[in-house]
Structures are given as structure tokens and as C-alpha cells.
Amino acid sequence: MRKTPSHTEKKMVYSIRSLKNGTGSVLIGASLVLLAMATPTISSDESTPTTNEPNNRNTTTLAQPLTDTAAGSGKNESDISSPGNANASLEKTEEKPATEPTTPAASPADPAPQTGQDRSSEPTTSTSPVTTETKAEEPIEDNYFRIHVKKLPEENKDAQGLWTWDDVEKPSENWPNGALSFKDAKKDDYGYYLDVKLKGEQAKKISFLINNTAGKNLTGDKSVEKLVPKMNEAWLDQDYKVFSYEPQPAGTVRVNYYRTDGNYDKKSLWYWGDVKNPSSAQWPDGTDFTATGKYGRYIDIPLNEAAREFGFLLLDESKQGDDVKIRKENYKFTDLKNHSQIFLKDDDESIYTNPYYVHDIRMTGAQHVGTSSIESSFSTLVGAKKEDILKHSNITNHLGNKVTITDVAIDEAGKKVTYSGDFSDTKHPYTVSYNSDQFTTKTSWRLKDETYSYDGKLGADLKEEGKQVDLTLWSPSADKVSVVVYDKNDPDKVVGTVALEKGERGTWKQTLDSTNKLGITDFTGYYYQYQIERQGKTVLALDPYAKSLAAWNSDDAKIDDAHKVAKAAFVDPAKLGPQDLTYGKIHNFKTREDAVIYEAHVRDFTSDPAIAKDLTKPFGTFEAFIEKLDYLKDLGVTHIQLLPVLSYYFVNELKNHEHLSDYASSNSNYNWGYDPQNYFSLTGMYSSDPKNPEKRIAEFKNLINEIHKRGMGAILDVVYNHTAKVDIFEDLEPNYYHFMDADGTPRTSFGGGRLGTTHHMTKRLLVDSIKYLVDTYKVDGFRFDMMGDHDAASIEEAYKAARALNPNLIMLGEGWRTYAGDENMPTKAADQDWMKHTDTVAVFSDDIRNNLKSGYPNEGQPAFITGGKRDVNTIFKNLIAQPTNFEADSPGDVIQYIAAHDNLTLFDIIAQSIKKDPSKAENYAEIHRRLRLGNLMVLTAQGTPFIHSGQEYGRTKQFRNPAYRTPVAEDKVPNKSHLLRDKDGNPFDYPYFIHDSYDSSDAVNKFDWTKATDGKAYPENVKSRDYMKGLIALRQSTDAFRLKSLQDIKDRVHLITVPGQNGVEKEDVVIGYQITAPNGDIYAVFVNADEKAREFNLGTAFAHLRNAEVLADENQAGSVGIANPKGLEWTEKGLKLNALTATVLRVSQNGTSHESTAEEKPDSTPSKPEHQNEASHPAHQDPAPEARPDSTKPDAKVADAENKPSQATADSQAEQPAQEAQASSVKEAVRKESVENSSKENISATPDRQAELPNTGIKNENKLLFAGISLLALLGLGFLLKNKKEN
């Protein structure tokens, strides 16, 4: 194997010209070698761009797609050249949402002048190979739009493409390979460019991104609006910001001046401000407009560093006196930060930032928001005056009659104007104009809420033993609504159509029975859709309140309107499934801090072929899941969180029985479920018979019942933040169900619509469906996907409604700060910042995740458990449910986790971070030791712990397809994969690991039951599994790790490893802290994530811990004391832990252990709770050695025991009230030590105290090294001078 040299391993070659000079040369050379050795090594990690997929993912293919990726169809995975386009299934990103599209200016009317070409910027040299290179641009064909790119994100342009959507002729489809390839790009002096065909003259918005064949969104979503019809190109700068002109080199602004008369004689510019060379000649001798460019004449002005603004005057030097000023007023431009060109025209007073002379204050849309108000959005309203807005505005009704504007209100920050008047006609639109901008109003959701909000019953209610169905649909803008009924045995066969009658407040109603002449006596199992006619257009829509569906196949969606969305089924859920189903009585659970949540995917849990012979029900189903529940009961978790089980879009349910045994990471009939189609109906993917709409209901009820029988609860993962397709709700009622842009168009996310939960009927949908799921299925909680996309009020209302039904219910969600809402209508979001205002719903803590194992945006970089030093106080704060990136006023606000379904598994991220190939026995063991450290820290943290399925045994999503055992070409890389390398740059054996497996096969996604349960075949995995089981038992055996309030935590939890004391650095890989349980028992947690043994000095304050029993060591954990613990030893100063070892100690209130101690066994023989496979290892399996990482390195000794806690820590401890006698004595010891230190400053800030800390050796070694270098260099120089004199 070739070893990649680091920066300090460069080979130095010297020529010794003569024997006399040899000694001097060698000495100087040696000094240089030593100098290089003294230089810190800089390692270069492989770049891992953020994966942000585009908004559009399922439209029409472009003519020149990217070269196909390696991800196969599942039919011939070993053929790496076989085509395999990605399934258009949706992706959600836990770490961070897709970049919002650029918000462009409004469409103008005036084209830019075309007075010549200009290419004055410096040419860009690309390292990418050039297929077609032209220095001058080719003309742009009619109905095409040219996109210029300064530089491509990656070197291999053939593996990158332009993914397009919105107003293009053929939006891209088949992510990621359907993009327009840069292989076909041309090149000019600016960079590369591609031409995209538009869908016609009506095209206004072009959205795009640059991706690669590995499925990475390299630029984030971008968009450009055509400011005028003739606008046909845009530029991306080096940071991929979009401009309507060619960006200039940094430090320069170009002033373009266009005169319609073509006369530039003696026209000049006088300028000042943040410019390098302000005009200083004799007035009025300005800088002449002599250079000719694309937009008239121009002057390039060098700017000062960090320039913000400059002022200028346009001059006509042929005139005299004050007439020399073309305009008497000074011009001032204040946005040099964002623009490198400005555009002037004749004597126009405006400074334009586009070459089409479109005014900055432009109307961009209009909405009818109330019976007395119309709201218009504007590009900007900075400097706008009320009288000017009134003067230039006009509103007419649908008959063309002018409507009096009685008042205007300007919202400069929100960029909107509200017109007051009599706008009581809610059936017809109004026309609003401002200067040359004119818009027809869209009916705002606010007007619909005011006029049509409805609180009655919705959906289909099956009654009278199936003989009658009561239908109610809300669609106030519909002109006509009918129900289309399909045959129960053939969902494609129409039985008949019945018109609905218009009801109150926008509803449509009908009762189906024997009088409807459909020939149906029992409607149970029949299917239906709503046919809605609106303004001459007819659509078929899915009932949003449907209780079940026909079998769904998204591959058929393009057949016709009847197949683009599912068909609802008439069912009565109350009569299905176990009749004794009730709310769960969960063991070891009273409050949310007691929960131990286990996240699982229904299909993954039973798709392992190794258990096929053991299952009596079809794999991947609700029924099969029941057969493996005892494993989770044995593990000890309180709640099972199921990835989405409600109907999702991109899947073929009719093929759910087909096992995806070949390795593939795209084009799989598999889905996580984050592309919702309906919020009441279950998917058929996990049913034993997807064709039977009642089966899925009965089987899911039975699963919940069996979970409850085992003393566990069920949490549903729900996805209200976006839908699979925007039309699912737009067809029901346009411009209502989603959050809206300022012009009234729906906002999208991940290809679907962002559900606008601030709108009354959308909030009803969310709250009603949550209530239905609790009432019908008796579930015990909800996890909200991208909860930060929602307003806090809606989530709070849903929580209260659900808790009214099930008082033990818990809610949690992703609280990332992603709220978009309705444009310019901010409100309180249900994100992490909300936690200080509520104690109802919890959020995931990315702070503990990122600090313990790394995460966005630095996933894969060393963190606490992977060798990366972290701030000890930050780690401690996270462990006591006080993350540093948001305020939690209750420990239950915080979900403590280091792994979830998103991104790499914990095992894989550890391997990536420490750069060690798990195929090597010693590396495999080390990864597991680090994994156990992470699991211990999460399970002993305050708050609510969360476990990803398989995290307990070291689940991996390594891509073990033989065709990918070594790296492949960029255009063959598996979709959603990371290529992992060791510290020398060598790829791992099977180097590809799937980080987001939502479209991968069962081979990638399966829960590996052999690794989880077979201690002979996989001892290291089963040891980790048993370790997790023991940690859960330990957590549940005491309240110490489940404190209920911040005050309790402040009183009972104390940091032992204070930074700056006893050898603990500010940033370190060790931590120790103590907890006093409410019953007086004292617990201590010590973690050594260092690669060498570390000693923890207990001093006198924590000397009582010497009498503790050990509950966790390097091999096992539990609530029972370990007789002969491994990996730790008591020393004179305290406790020493081996490398990569943690321990939990307990000092019981009565001074004795709670139970008889357990004997530590040499090989920690694990339990076999479920499945025991005694067979030999499969040929491709991972090794499972018992080897340990090298722990023979010198111990890191601490300073003497006289080093005391810092004053701040001591004071905080001394002030805390005593709860029990032992706790009081501990605090008294701390107080006494703090008194001795009372006159001293914090150790970390005092030079004298720093001298007491142990030397690491680095400082002294460097001094000696540089002294040696200097001596060698001087000796060498002396030899050379001496030789020179002799010569």
C-alpha cells in the first residue's frame, strides 16, 4: 500500500558539493529536518459536502443526463456500469434543511441595452478537463436561458450537473443522474455555461442547483426570476450567489451608464466615499466614460477594503457652472457588499442593481386578505412614502370599476402594503396596480379563514353496518364536487359518480345509501376519490380525512389523474382489530425523563434473511414486528418509536413482499416514509395484504396491543412539515393549505408543500389527525419531523388535545430553527428556542450529538468519544440537560442522543472519525469501545435518552457489494455514500458507507440479528448490546439519572473534573461528575475517552467515592455491583481508568450495595434473548475479535491531591442546600476546600497556579528541540565560513 505523506514528511535532498563543505551542509540540513519535525502535522480530511436535495424531484428528464451512478436497480448490483436512477422518494435532513431558494426581484418590462460585448474580468483557470472551450460566448437561442458558473464545486466536471425545475421546458427527474451534465458545458473567459430551454414566453422563474452523481447538492437550491421578457442569462459567482450581470473581481465596482441618444462625449463621473482613489482633479474634471461594455459605457472603480458605500455625480463637462451636473442631487450607493455592478440611465434619478433598469420598489403580488383589506407585496419599501404609494396605486373590481382606497399601511420590514377599502366581493378577484406593475388578487388563506373556517365533522363516516356513508369535504372555491366510487375488488373500475351538495362555510356534503342508485348495499371496502371542478378545470383528489386507502403504487402516478394520488377506502376502524386495545401501562415510566426511546423502522426490524426461518408472518410487516418484540422488552426500553407508518408516496406497496437482498442505495422499493400522502391512513407497505384496506388497521392495532402487553409504549413519527406533492392539498383548495409566498403562491419543501399550520383548516387537519391516531390506535406519543417548521401554537394545541385522551402521552420533535411560515409573517416557532416557554414537548439536542460524536456541519471530524478534545464544561452542561445552543428550563425538554436514522450510524461515524478500518480486528474492537463510551454517556445523562435501532450492537450500513470493495469512478459512486479512508489515506476494505439509506435495499438497511444476539459469532457486538441493556437497567434502578427539575440538578449534580485542575485541560477527553439521588445514594460517572490511561484525583471533597461499588466497567454495566471490575484501579490519589474506559460508581446510603455483586467474567459471556445463530460467520461478515487497543502508553498523571476545585465551582457547591446527611458531608468537604482557595483566582487564569499543573512535556521538548536546531545551524554556518576562509 502506498502511504500518503503528510506535510512534515516531505523528503529533503541536499547536494554536498565537496568533502570540505560536507560537514556544514549536513549540520544545516539536520537542523532543517528537525525544524520540520517541530512543525505541527496538518492532516487533510476528505471533504464531505452537505446533502441538500432539491425541491423538485419527480418531473421530466432533461435531454443530456449525468453519467449514471453506481447504485443499481437491485437486479444486477455487481455490474457497476448498469443504469440505476434514484427513486424520487423524499429525503429529510435532520442536521439542517435545504437552502432556501434565492428570492429574486419582480419581473420588469424594460430590456437592457445591447451595445456590445464585454469580458473584462480575469479568466478563471479550472483544474477540470475541458470538453468544449470557447473564449467568446455563442449567441443564446430564442427561448433558452444561459447560466454562467464561475467555477464548479468539484474538479470532475463530467460527474456534475445542473438540476433544474420551475419554468423550464423539461424539469429534471431521476435524482441525481437526470441533471444536465457539465460534460456538455462550454467555457468562456468567465467560466462554464449551460443553456436551459424554457417552457415558453410565460416562463418567469428558473430554479436550479449543481449536484454530482453521488447525490450531493453542491450549491444549495438557487433560483432566478426573469426581470423582463428578454432577460436570458444569469451568473453564479465563486460562492454560487446569483446575479443578473457578470460579477466583477473583488475590490471593484463597475458603474455602467447608458444613454439612449448614444452621446457619451465629455460625460464623466465624479466619485468619493469607500473608494481607493476618489476624484481629486480640478473640478469638474471627472473620470470619462470611455470603455464600452455590454450595457453602454462603464468605469471600473477600485474600492477600499470592506467598502460599503460610495457617492458620485454624473457630469457633462461640455457645460458650465452648476449645469455640468446631469442631475443636481448627489447619487449614493450603499450596497457594495452585495453588488459589484450598478446601472445608470440618462438622467434617471435611480441607481439600478440590474441591467434591465427595473425599479427597486416594485409590486410583486397581491392577495385579498379580508373583506376590507388587500395586501400587496413589494420588492422593497425602504424610503417609501404613504402619499407616493396612494398616488401611484389603483384597484379595480372584476367589472373594471375603480374601488376607492380609503387608507394604506406600509410595513417596510415585511415589504408589504395593506390597502383598506370595501373589498366585500369574495367571489371575484380584484386588480391592483402600482406604476407599471399590475396583479390580479389571489384569495388569501386569511380571507378564507375569516369567511369559511369550519369546525364540523369532515371525512367519510361509515354507518349502519356499511349501508350508509356520510361525506363532508371542505373546498370553498370549488364550483362543483362529486364523489367517484370504485369497485372494492378492482380499484380502477368506476362504479358510479354522485354529486355532493354545497353546505355551510365552504363545505360539500352527501349521504351514500341505497337511494344513490350505485347498486351497493354494503359500502365497506369500496374506494373513492373526490372530483372537483373549479374555474373550468377538473381534478381528482384524495380525501384528507380518509381512514384507509387502496394499495398504492407511485410508479402509476403518471398514468392519469385517477392514479396520481391514492384512492380512499370506506372503513370503520372501530370494528377492526383487538377490541381490548387500551392505553398502555408502561413499566418504569411516570414522566418524560423516565422514557428510554428506541427508534425502529418496521421493515428493517425483520428483513434480515437470518431470521426468515424463525418468522411465522411475512417479513417487514406489523405482524412480523410483533414476533421480535421480546428483544426490545429484554433490552429494557420504555417506548418504541416507529419511523413513519402513515401513507407515504414513493413506493410500490404491491411488491412489499419482495426481499431486496442485493446491495443498492437507490432505485429500491424501500422508503423511510418522510413523503406523506395522508395523515389518517396507514401505509400498506407493512400490511400482510396491502390490497385489503382493513387489514393494515387491524394488524397495526394488534402491534400496539402487543407492545402494551409487554409494558412498553408506542411513539409515531409524523411528518406534517411537508407533503410528498404540493398538488395533494392544492387540488383540494388552492392557495390555502400551505404556507404562502408574499405573492400568494404555496411554499414548498423537499418537493412537496410546506403545510401552513397557522391557517385554521390546516391546523385542524394536524390536530384532528393526532386526536384520531391516539383515540383509534391508543398510541403513547409522537415525534414531529422538522418540528421547527411549525408554529408553536399548533404543536401545543395538538399536545393538549392528545394528552386529554392519553394523560401519559409524550411528544418530541426536531427543533431545528427552520421556520419559514408565510412570507413576512413571523410567529413563534416550535423550535429549540421555544423550550424556555413550554414544558410540554421536547426537542433533540444537536449540541450533545455534535460534541460527543460530531454532526452537522462537521460530521466525521473527531469529537469527544472519537479522540477530539472538547470543552469539558460544555460536555458537562449537555450531560445535565443544559445544552449550550438553546435554553432548556426543564431536563425533560432535552432529548439526549448521538444517533438516529439520518446520516451515518454511530458505528460508521466512529470508524470515519478515527480513520480506522473495521475489517481489522484491533480497529473493530476499538470502535466498539468508543461506541460503549457514547452509549454510557447518553444513558446516564439527565433528560430523555434516545437510541437508534442497532445502536446497541454497532449497526453498520457498509456497502458490501463486491463490485465496490475498492473505490470506483466518481460517476459510479453509490448514492448517499461516504468513502472512508484510514489515516494514511488508504481506502477501507469496502470503503463506501451509506449515510442516508431512505432509498437503499434491505441488504443495507436490515437489523442484523446475528450481530445483535449471537455471542459466539460476534462477541464484541453482543457485548455492546448487553452493555446497553445494563445501562438501561442502571438508569431505571435510580432517580439519579432522571431528575425532574433544573433546581434538582443544580443541587445534586457536581462536576469533579474541573478544567484547570488536577491535569484536566479546558478542552479534554475526560470527564467525571457526581450525582446525589433523592434517596441519598451517591453516583459518580467517569469517562476516559483518551487513548491512554488517565487518573482522576478525588481529593477530599470526593474521597467518599473510594467506598463505592462499581456498576459499570470496560466490559459490562448494570444495577448490580461488579466484584472484579476491569479497566479501572484505585490509586493513592483517586481512580485510574484505562484508555477508552468509563465507569459508574455508587455509594449507597446505608454504605452497602443494593444487591449481591456480580462476578466479572473474563470474556463477559452475553445473554441470548432472542435469536441464537450458532452457524459460522458468513463470508462477508465483520470480524468480532476480543482484542483491545494498545493501553500500554504512559499514564496521564494528575497533579497532587492538594489542588482544589476552582472558587466558582466551590462556591456554587457550598451554596447548595443539603438534602441528605451524606450529601451534606460531601458539600461540607467541598466548602472547606473552597475556603482554603478563597483568596486565589481561578486556576486556569493564574500563572502561579498554572505552574502547579503537570507538564505535558510539549513545552520543554519544544524548547530543547529549537535549542538543538539553533546549535546545529550555528555549527554548520561556522564550518562553512571556516571553509570559505581557507579557500
Swiss-Prot record:
Ca(2+) 2 binds at M835, T838, D839, D889, D893. Virulence factor. Involved in the degradation of glycogen of the mammalian host cells. Hydrolyzes the alpha-1,6-branchpoints of glycogen. Hydrolyzes pullulan. Does not hydrolyze dextran. Binds to mouse lung alveolar type II cells that are rich in glycogen stores. Residues 1257-1287 form a propeptide. Residues 1156-1203, 1228-1239 have a biased composition (Basic and acidic residues). This is Pullulanase A. Its EC number is 3.2.1.41. Ca(2+) 1 binds at S668, Y670, D999. It comes from Streptococcus pneumoniae. One of its GO terms (molecular function) is carbohydrate binding. Residues 79-90 have a biased composition (Polar residues). It is found in: Secreted, Cell wall; Cell surface. GO terms for cellular component: cell surface; extracellular region; Gram-positive-bacterium-type cell wall. Residues 42-139, 1147-1255 are annotated as: Disordered. It is a peptidoglycan-anchor. Residues 1-44 form the signal peptide. The gene is spuA. Belongs to the glycosyl hydrolase 13 family. Keywords: Calcium, Cell wall, Glycosidase, Hydrolase, Metal-binding, Peptidoglycan-anchor, Secreted, Signal, Virulence. A motif (LPXTG sorting signal) lies at residues 1253-1257. The keyword Mitochondrion does not apply. The active site is at D785, E814. It holds the Pfam family YSIRK_signal. The N-terminal tandem family 41 carbohydrate-binding modules (CBM) are involved in carbohydrate binding. The C-terminal glycosyl hydrolase 13 (GH13) domain is involved in catalysis. Inhibited by 4-O-alpha-D-glucopyranosylmoranoline (G1M).
